[in-house]
Amino acid sequence: MPDVTGDLAPLTPGARVLVTGAGITGRAVLGALAPLEVAATLCDDNADALAALAAKGVAVIAPGDAIASIGDYALVVTSPGFAPSAPVLAAAAAAGVPIWGDVELAWRLDAAGRYGPPRRWLVVTGTNGKTTTTSMLHDMLVAGGRRSVLCGNIGDPVLAVLDQPAELLAVELSSFQLHWAPSLRPEAGVVLNVAEDHLDWHGSMAAYARDKARVLDGRVAVVGLDDPVAAGLLPTAAATVRVGFRLGDPAAGELGVRDGKLIDRAFDDGVELADCADIGVAGPIGVLDALGAAALARAVGVAPGAIGAALASFQVGRHRAEVVGTVDGVVFIDDSKATNPHAAQASITAYDRVVWVAGGLLKGASVDELVRQVANRLAGAVLIGRDRQMVADALSRHAPDVPVVELVAGEDSGVLGTNESIESVGDHVTRVIEVGGRPVSDAVMSAVVSAARDLASPGDTVLLAPAGASFDQFSGYGQRGDAFAAAVRAAVG
């Protein structure tokens, strides 16, 4: 595609711009557009949100009216949650109206010098590990004395931080954001891994991988070589420098692990960066996240000592393999952010013997391969949420000896207290506990912790790594994790 870096052609004074989405991103877009003297109008299907913004003087329009007048707009700037199939975006595409995401707008404004000298963008994406890796990267940059701002899918939108003094942006981007950012050319970008996720949004695994690969079109492209899909993106990357990382001994042009140390053979000839034992995220996934972050930091010249110091002091974020308590010799860990099978598998493999708390909304993903890979680590499973039966079926097929407790709650349960029954499929026996009472989230997690304690022995780990989204029973993965932690605290007394 032609180089459109810094091209703001549709944003001439007086041009009509439609902004879709009334949330944090949409408001950030309006703020960025205001100095450009364009006529911005906000569209959302949430009538209450539109009314609240209209009361503050924001020009708003209902989706139906926006579709009817779509040809009057010079540009649509969309929030990343809107899929290409969304009616207003489909209408814009059919009418030939350009569609940018908020990241595309931020990239072009920054490249055009609207906020001073353009920053160098270091972009992290992947199905799993994005937030931890981006946080590690930011800490490495700061430890190296660089002015860095953490932004994107973590914290503030990129548009909201461009007025801050910074040399570098540590940016976490989702596949949704990347889909709508075709001109992005970061200083360095990493694809950590690519597994089935959001296929309902992207339409296919190939389309999902293509959107992830957009971070590889800048100067330095980095991929996780232990992930076959991510590794397959490197040969076709447009970047002038291509780097891989792996858990094993690195070849030339790679980062990896040798004798328990992180080793850089891409930007140096075998220099040690850190001791794996100092990484504050358990298991191989923590090492992989550290390698991905280190590759981007090394791409902009951060010294090995700064990388080691940052990793030694790094603390994992909330709901990401977070230890929330110990009861009778059993450690309880909140990894509620493990919202797909790939993330759950990585989480479980960090521990020897696990009582697995799983379920929620699987979004069409299969858990069969996950269960096959971790069956020998499972001491038991406690299943929650709308798609719990899919997990139960996979356990019956691939881990028939693992005891299972299935919790039925919310709309699926008509009881006010707690009922219990036994179900069997062949030789596989499942305890079914019906949980009543309100709020549902508290009742569910209280029952989860009680059931998990029955299944666990001293030395085991009770791991909330659901492999599914949370919105069937919780407001988000954060509330799910908070409810789990509160139930553990109550059990401790």
From Swiss-Prot:
Q: Which organism is it from?
A: Mycolicibacterium smegmatis (strain ATCC 700084 / mc(2)155)
Q: Which cysteines form disulfides? A: none
Q: Which family does it belong to?
A: Belongs to the MurCDEF family.
Q: Which Pfam families match?
A: Mur_ligase_C (PF02875), Mur_ligase_M (PF08245), MurD-like_N (PF21799)
Superkingdom as given in the UniProt entry: Bacteria
- Name the record gives this protein: UDP-N-acetylmuramoylalanine--D-glutamate ligase
> Which lineage is the organism of this entry classified under, starting from the top rank?
Bacteria, Bacillati, Actinomycetota, Actinomycetes, Mycobacteriales
SUPFAM superfamilies linked to this entry: MurCD N-terminal domain, MurD-like peptide ligases, catalytic domain, MurD-like peptide ligases, peptide-binding domain
Q: Name one GO biological process term.
A: cell division
